Swiss-Prot record:
It comes from Rattus norvegicus. Residues 204-232 form a coiled coil. The keyword Coiled coil applies. Residues 78-96, 113-135, 215-226 have a biased composition (Basic and acidic residues). Residues 38-62, 248-265 have a biased composition (Acidic residues). The modification Phosphothreonine is found at T202. The keyword Phosphoprotein applies. PANTHER family: COILED-COIL DOMAIN-CONTAINING PROTEIN 82, PHORBOL-ESTER_DAG-TYPE DOMAIN-CONTAINING PROTEIN. Keywords: Coiled coil, Phosphoprotein. This is Coiled-coil domain-containing protein 82. GO terms for cellular component: nucleus. Transmembrane segments: none annotated.
Length: 516
């Protein structure tokens, strides 16, 4: 009865073990472990009670000798009791060890414990001598694995840029750990170094900058002095040619010039002089401008800041004066005229020849294959007439190329001087005829108009001067009156428009790209 009851109790205790839960659900795992502890405690209490009864019953049977047991049955009962005692000891040790274990142990260890519980009973009954050692090994492994799990702690991420103490992470260590980034001290050191370098470089660069500023200001002063000298030299020339000049104006000019020199000296004194010799050389360069250099500057059209129409008006006025006084242009180009208005006219004449007409003529010739003889003929004769004729398959007399020539070019007129506009009566009735192609005829027309434009303009001025009544008035007054009339009537503007048209036609002329 006792054995059957004990067997039923162990069997019931097995069935009360809950099923294994998933390893992911930690709450269910903890709950199953707690239930397992309760069932093991009940089982231990029942087994202790049963073992006491078995011991009492065995003693009574042995002492009284009331029961007759065979040898075989006695042999079988002894090992059963021994195994039961061993199981009770092992389970009591297991319960004590589990009570001290952490409830947060891994589910894998609990599965191994459950498997050993299910497999322990038949193994113990078949091999009673090995049960105790086997259970001791299992409990030792479980304890070691639990201790290892308790010691393992996940690491914490620490910021590099922050400065903190690590006393909270480890209770045992009292060492203060400083963790700081190296960017901030570098940044401060670089700033200090850069500031020191800048302070060192600034005194080194300051003398060079001062020298540059000093030379720039000296150049400006030289330019101012040159302009003033030009202005004063022009005034002096005009005053020398005039019959009478007021002394008050001269005094004012002298005062102004003296004040300007004083201002220049005052500005130069404020400079930090590095080399006195260089300063003297710069001053001498500004003061040693001769009249010949000033003449070249005025004659050069690059130094003229007037517009095209202003230059053209001066040219018309110069041609009008030469129409009344034939020696004006000759003396002007010879440098005998020193007045400012005469120098302005000379500058405008150079500007018309060197800047307006000559570059276009060179461009037209450079893009053609004209013979030198044909070019000289076109430049020498002032009159041109182009006529259409029946085409001939022959060589062009202008460029020498073989093509269909259907234009006849006739050159005539007197030879003249391009500067003084004086004509030459030698072979005045001579004529030249050339048979050319279409492209050469167009090029000849444009080239001749530009080359002889100033001479044609002079002829028009002469015709106007001859038709107008002069009377007893002076040449200067007559030229002024005629110039005002031509300007009001729009004649000067019209001639300027013709010049612009010729210049544009020369710029946009297409050479031998046209098909015949």
């Amino acid at each position: 009865m006792v054995h059957a009851r004990r067997h039923e109790t162990r069997k019931n205790s097995k069935t009360q073990v809950p099923e294994q839960k998933s390893r992911v659900d930690w709450r269910r795992t903890k709950r199953s472990v707690s239930q397992l502890f309760d069932s093991d405690e009940e089982l231990d209490s029942d087994e202790e009670i049963g073992s006491d009864e078995d011991l009492d019953g065995g003693e009574s049977i042995d002492s009284d000798g009331k029961l007759d047991i065979s040898k075989d049955s006695g042999i079988n009962e002894i090992p059963e009791k021994e195994t039961e005692l061993n199981l009770i000891k092992v389970e009591s040790e297991r319960s004590n060890s589990k009570c001290h274990m952490n409830t947060s142990s891994s589910s894998a260890d609990e599965e191994e414990m459950n498997k050993t519980k299910h497999n322990d009973l038949p193994d113990d009954e078949a091999h009673p001598g090995q049960a105790e050692g086997h259970h001791n090994k299992l409990t030792g492994q479980v304890l070691e694995e639990d201790v290892e799990d308790e010691c393992i702690k996940p690491g914490k991420r620490k910021r590099l840029s922050s400065v903190m103490y690590d006393s909270d992470e480890s209770d045992d260590s009292d060492i203060l750990v400083r963790k700081a980034s190296a960017k901030h001290p570098r940044r401060v050191v670089e700033d200090e170094c850069s500031s020191l370098e800048m302070e060192r470089e600034t005194p080194e660069k300051s003398p060079a900058a001062r020298k540059r500023e000093y030379h720039q200001k000296l150049q400006e002063l030289c330019e101012r002095s040159r302009q003033k000298q030009r202005h004063n030299s022009g005034r002096n020339c005009e005053s020398s040619e005039k019959d009478s000049c007021s002394s008050t104006d001269e005094d004012e000019d002298d005062d102004d010039y003296g004040d300007a020199e004083n201002e220049d000296d005052y500005m130069i004194d404020d400079f930090v002089v590095g080399d006195e010799e260089a300063d003297e050389e710069n001053k001498n360069q500004g003061e040693n401008l001769t009249t010949s250099q000033l003449k070249l500057v005025k004659q050069n059209s690059l130094y003229s800041f007037s517009d095209h129409y202003t230059h053209f008006e001066r040219v018309v006025k110069a041609l009008l004066i030469n129409a009344f006084d034939g020696s004006f242009l000759e003396t002007l180009y010879a440098g005998k005229r020193k007045k400012s208005y005469a120098q302005d006219m000379l500058t405008s004449l150079h500007y018309l020849d060197d800047r307006f007409i000559q570059p276009r003529l060179e461009s037209l010739v450079s893009r053609s294959r004209w013979r030198e003889q044909y070019k000289e003929r076109v430049e020498s004769y002032s009159d041109l007439s182009i006529h259409w004729k029946s085409p001939e398959n022959c060589g062009c007399q202008a460029c020498g190329l073989h093509r269909y020539c259907k234009f006849s070019v006739r050159l005539s007129g007197k030879l003249y001087n391009t500067r003084t506009m004086e004509t030459d009566d030698f072979m005045s009735r001579d004529k030249q005829v050339f048979i050319v192609g279409r492209i050469c005829a167009e090029r000849t027309k444009i080239y001749h108009k530009l080359k002889h434009f100033k001479f044609k303009l002079y002829q028009d001025c002469c015709s106007i001067a001859y038709t107008k009544e002069v009377g007893d008035e002076q040449v200067k007054d007559t030229v002024k009156r005629l110039f005002c009339q031509l300007k009001k009537s729009g004649w000067i503007r019209k001639k300027h428009g013709q010049l612009e048209e010729y210049l544009n036609s020369a710029d946009y002329f297409q050479d031998e790209k046209f098909k015949l």
